[in-house]
Regions:
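Residue at the conserved pre-P-loop
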Residues: 18, 32-33
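Conserved catalytic Walker-motif region of ABC-type ATPase nucleotide-binding domains
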Residues: 9
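Conserved C-terminal guanine-recognition region of P-loop GTPase G domains, centered on the G4
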Residues: 105-174
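A short, flexible loop at the N-terminus of ABC-type nucleotide-binding domains that lies
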Residues: 2-6, 15-26
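Canonical P-loop GTPase G-domain recognition
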Residues: 153-210
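Conserved G1/Walker A P-loop phosphate-binding module
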Residues: 48-96
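The feature captures the beta-strand-to-loop junction immediately N-terminal to the Walker
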Residues: 40-42, 63
Length: 326
């Protein structure tokens, strides 16, 4: 079902009087609560970890490296009450190249295309320039903004309360919800709070759908995640992963992928002594891809230099960073 048809059906739904809506809910029209919810958060705040926790499966990659999330990733949680489409956006930051501009544009556009915004922060009373910049952006948003305090299992309760007071003075949040994405503490309550603010309307996806990402893209992101975990600080910003081939043969998925970097010196580091680093990235990625696809995987990796690819619209589109597909 196209998004235009869904939005038209939602308009028809809202045209009914409240009593008529109540009567219609008894019919199998899939008219429950449901809409899109944007995830925002600084590097290392745990956005992807929380989103994976909420849907019960790993879709978004996790790393403490800056700007890990590059595309707008949508995951779907369907309950008896309705459907939440979580939109994991790249963080808002000062762009240094076209890739950075692409990421910031996606993040800012997403804020105007959802019914609820979740802003994920770590428990600290220090509100710096970066946080204040995001707060100013959120004040322009017409939809409810829920402040989610992650990693509360790492601090004392009194510190969390002090932190809540500090942020309340900065912005009028619709709700403030403390959670631990790592342990799953209070995440069910977060879902209940989100549902309070969602409109009634048809669901965007079938009940068994958990993401809009194609398998090839998820596989590419898994490989990139393992590279992020293994490589030095200066390299991850300049790498991308292209899936050259992915096919099933005799119950084994054969995948050929290329890790793209920007410098010849980086290529040597990614390969490692006698191929040791590339083997490490490949083995850890293969294990997780097998869990995702539920089959044996034969993964072959290559490394290729594409200088300044982050400033090339053509190469960015080749590597899956396309605004026209948003």
């Amino acid at each position: 079902m196209s998004e235009e048809i869904i939005l038209e059906a939602r308009d028809i739904w809202h045209s009914y009087e409240e009593n008529d809506r109540f009567s219609l809910q008894g019919l199998d029209l899939k008219v429950k609560k449901g809409s899109k919810v944007a995830f925002m958060g600084a590097n290392g705040s745990g956005k992807s970890t929380l989103m994976n926790r909420l849907i019960g499966q790993k879709i978004a990659i996790t790393s403490n490296k800056p700007q890990t999330t590059r595309n707008r990733i949508q995951t779907v949680l369907t309950t008896e009450e309705g459907q939440i489409v979580f939109v994991d956006t790249p963080g808002i930051h000062k762009a240094k190249n076209k890739l950075g501009e692409y990421m910031v544009n996606i993040a800012e556009r997403s804020l105007n295309e959802v019914d609820v915004v979740l802003w994920l922060v770590e428990p600290s009373t220090f509100i710096g320039a970066g946080e204040k910049h995001i707060i100013e952006q959120l004040k322009k948003v017409k939809t409810p903004v829920i402040l989610v305090i992650n990693k509360v299992d790492m601090v004392k309760k009194e510190e969390v309360l002090t932190f809540i007071d500090a942020y309340r003075k900065e912005c009028d949040f619709a709700e403030i919800v403390p959670v631990s994405a790592r342990r799953g503490d209070n995440t069910d309550e977060l879902v209940n709070v989100i549902m309070k603010y969602l409109p009634y309307g048809p669901q965007f996806y079938d009940e068994d759908t958990i993401t809009d990402q194609p398998e090839r893209q998820i596989v590419a992101e898994i490989i990139r995640e393992k590279a992020l975990h293994s490589l030095n600080e200066e390299i991850p910003h300049g790498i991308a992963v292209a899936i050259d081939q992915m096919k099933m043969n005799h119950k084994v998925c054969h995948i050929d992928a290329t890790i793209i970097c920007e410098r010849d010196s980086h290529k040597g580091i990614i390969i490692g002594k006698q191929g040791s680093m590339l083997k490490k990235i490949g083995s850890t990625a293969r294990f997780e891809i097998e869990r995702l696809l539920d089959c044996k995987v034969n993964l072959k990796l290559w490394v290729k230099v594409q200088k300044n690819w982050r400033d090339s619209d053509y190469m960015m589109k080749n590597f899956g960073y396309r605004e026209d597909e948003m």
